Amino acid sequence: MNLQIIRSEPGHKDEIINLYRNIADISDGIIRCRDEITDEYVSGFLKNATERGLSLVGIVNNKIVAEIHAYTPNIFAFQHLLTDLTIVVDRDYQGQGIGRKIFERFLDIVKTELTHIYRIELYTREHNLRNVRFYESLGFVNEGGQKDKIYVSPMVFETPVHMAWFNPIYMKKE
């Protein structure tokens, strides 16, 4: 399999929408429901990531099969972080190392090009130990849970854990 990883572009929007909708109904997947994957949502995070963060796509055989993004909030006190990190891999390509490769490339770009970024943040469901271990293997630290923050249905909630990665070359110039 030949995986190409490049920066996201506005022209990728429709393919990214389809990718997100394709995986939105996977149990323990992304937090958004299928009907919340809108043009406005994807356009919004692509704009934010392009202007104040980073978004990458993974392409196999001219098809976008993965996407990762995070961005800096438009708040002075948070200028050192990327947050709302989301990563998706097409269900037909999961388990093939694509998620790890695109995530590692993302972190490499932060270390080499975005050295003003000290911290990257994400949430994952506490009970999804596979994801927790995956993020820990990339260097993320579990900063604790937020009890019952995720609404599932009346009287059914889930606890996400907040995880952070710290840039080992923060503010170092070559």
Model-derived features with residue positions:
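Conserved acetyl-CoA-binding loop-helix of GNAT-fold acetyltransferases
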Residues: 89, 95-109, 133-137
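A short helix-loop-beta-strand connector motif used in the catalytic cores of GNAT acetyltransferases and
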Residues: 45-57
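Conserved catalytic-core motifs of GNAT/GCN5-like acyltransferases
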Residues: 121-124, 136-156
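A short beta-loop-alpha structural element at the N-terminal edge
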Residues: 3-18
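Conserved GNAT-fold acetyl-CoA-binding loop/helix
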Residues: 24-44
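Conserved GNAT acetyl-CoA-binding A-motif
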Residues: 110-124
